[in-house]
Amino acid sequence: MNDLVNLLDLDADALTAYCGELGEKPFRARQLQRWIHQFGASRFDAMSDLAKSLREKLATRAEIRSPAAITDNLSADGTRKWLLDVGNGNAVETVYIPEETRGTLCVSSQAGCAVNCRFCSTGKQGFSRNLTTGEIIGQLWMAEFAMREQLGRGPKDDRVISNVVMMGMGEPLLNYDAVVPAMRLMLDDNAYGLSRRRVTLSTSGVVPMMDRLSKDLPVALAVSLHASNDALRDVLVPLNKKYPLAELMAACRRYLEFAPRDFITFEYCMLDGVNDGVEHARELLKLVADVPCKFNLIPFNPFPESGLKRSNNDQIRRFAQVLMDAGIVTTIRKTRGDDIDAACGQLAGEVKDRTRLAERGKFGKITPLVPVAATGQAGEARPA
């Protein structure tokens, strides 16, 4: 059994408390945090300004460990996707998306997902477990320093990753106690120093936790809407049966009182013949009439056995035009990295399926598809 404390699990307050338990003053925690999150150090003996006595204590009591990479794939368009091992046959996905003025990392919060949206590959896997704070922030830690090795730092010695979206596998608000400390580290100037406007949490609409987040750590909010009425959303997003649209819209209005942005982003997956009619767009206008918002229309990314099809481009444009004619800012998400993956969650689902087969004796051992050595500082092997 591993009794070492993973320091990636600790935000600033928790790290200060831990150093106090070791008999160290608070400034040592700040030094340690900088080494980990600003410089990507994974070895205590590399932390040259820490007292030797502290380094020796840490070497026997603590570790810095992020999930190990099973695969690491780079698309022709610059998108980079990691499949990360979180144990017991479970894997999660992390994606870096380059754009002209920013680099965005899409982070997972759970292995699997209990919400089970009709169009989501992750939901079809079922729910395995919540990720720890260290497994969540570890995705940013791993990706930032991997991207620095690939691209170098920016012209002003900037970080490569300027934005984080909690839009990967899982429902973040159903893993609140691990997600919030991870986001605190993202915002901490002594760690990643992102602004609240540059960290976006996406939720399917867990209303009580939206209210809690608005008071604890109001970051930018995206809501997975995907339907214009309750009858349709009950089918596409089963959580709607618990928190119907009227409650969700009221929660969005309350959140805006605290939000760093003056609008909510509504995500809407475009499904051919299901939710993509002009009548659905007009119904949306009534639904969001008193919620300052923008829409992000997402072409459906097909996966096996979904039984759904992507709306064609002309239909997506017609749908978008209805919203834009009403004055709502509307974007159509570009499909990225098509040459390295399919739907979000599909690679992780393949690992889980292979694990289940192995447990039934059809495979002897689960081996990585493409073994990758993630690194911390240049030339430094990152521990598995």
Swiss-Prot record:
**What broad class of enzyme is this?**
transferase
Which compartment or compartments is the protein found in? Cytoplasm
- Keywords assigned by UniProt, alphabetized: 4Fe-4S, Cytoplasm, Disulfide bond, Iron, Iron-sulfur, Metal-binding, Methyltransferase, rRNA processing, S-adenosyl-L-methionine, Transferase, tRNA processing
| Swiss-Prot/TrEMBL catalytic activity | adenosine(2503) in 23S rRNA + 2 reduced [2Fe-2S]-[ferredoxin] + 2 S-adenosyl-L-methionine = 2-methyladenosine(2503) in 23S rRNA + 5'-deoxyadenosine + L-methionine + 2 oxidized [2Fe-2S]-[ferredoxin] + S-adenosyl-L-homocysteine; adenosine(37) in tRNA + 2 reduced [2Fe-2S]-[ferredoxin] + 2 S-adenosyl-L-methionine = 2-methyladenosine(37) in tRNA + 5'-deoxyadenosine + L-methionine + 2 oxidized [2Fe-2S]-[ferredoxin] + S-adenosyl-L-homocysteine
Q: Which GO CC terms are listed, alphabetically?
A: cytoplasm
Q: Which Cys-Cys disulphide bridges does the record give?
A: C106-C344
Show the CDD domains listed in the entry. Radical_SAM
* MF terms in GO: 4 iron, 4 sulfur cluster binding; metal ion binding; rRNA (adenine(2503)-C2-)-methyltransferase activity; rRNA binding; tRNA (adenine(37)-C2)-methyltransferase activity; tRNA binding
> Which residues act catalytically here?
E93, C344
The miscellaneous annotation reads: Reaction proceeds by a ping-pong mechanism involving intermediate methylation of a conserved cysteine residue.
Q: What function does this protein fulfil?
A: Specifically methylates position 2 of adenine 2503 in 23S rRNA and position 2 of adenine 37 in tRNAs. m2A2503 modification seems to play a crucial role in the proofreading step occurring at the peptidyl transferase center and thus would serve to optimize ribosomal fidelity.
Annotated NCBIfam families: rRNA_mod_RlmN
Which named protein is this? Answer: Dual-specificity RNA methyltransferase RlmN
